[in-house]
From Swiss-Prot:
Its main location: cytoplasm. GO terms for biological process: chaperone cofactor-dependent protein refolding. InterPro entries: Chaperonin_GroES, Chaperonin_GroES_sf, Chaprnonin_Cpn10_CS, GroES-like_sf. It is found in: Cytoplasm. It holds the Pfam family Cpn10. This is Co-chaperonin GroES 3.
Length: 105
């Protein structure tokens, strides 16, 4: 099935949560917190202003984003658990920067 979000909505694939704590303790599924990070897999065309002009979204497919703990609506599409939320629920885009030798020193 193909799903196309409307207006300023985006479809998010939630990032995988950690299965082990920093101290090495294995965390059971029932105690895991859901990650607040995910990948944008579909975007709507944008919202409209008072004059009817289309305002495009800032996020695009493939962006890694951060969102609030209670943001979005959980849905299952083609057997995959996804989130649908408005762009305003997204806190920011995570920049995938690779550390250089100068930055590492």
């Amino acid at each position: 099935m193909t799903f196309r979000p409307l207006l300023d909505r985006v479809v998010i694939r939630r990032a995988e949560g950690n299965t082990q704590s920093k101290g090495g303790i294995i965390i059971p599924d029932t105690a895991k917190e859901k990650p607040q990070e995910g990948e944008v897999i579909a975007v709507g065309p944008g919202s409209r202003d008072e004059s009817g002009k289309l305002i495009p979204l800032d996020v695009k497919i493939g962006d890694t984003i951060l969102f609030g703990k209670w943001s979005g609506t959980e849905v299952k599409i083609d057997g995959e658990d996804l989130l649908i939320m408005k762009e305003s629920d997204i806190m920011g885009i995570v920049a995938n920067t690779v550390p250089t030798a100068a930055n590492a020193a």
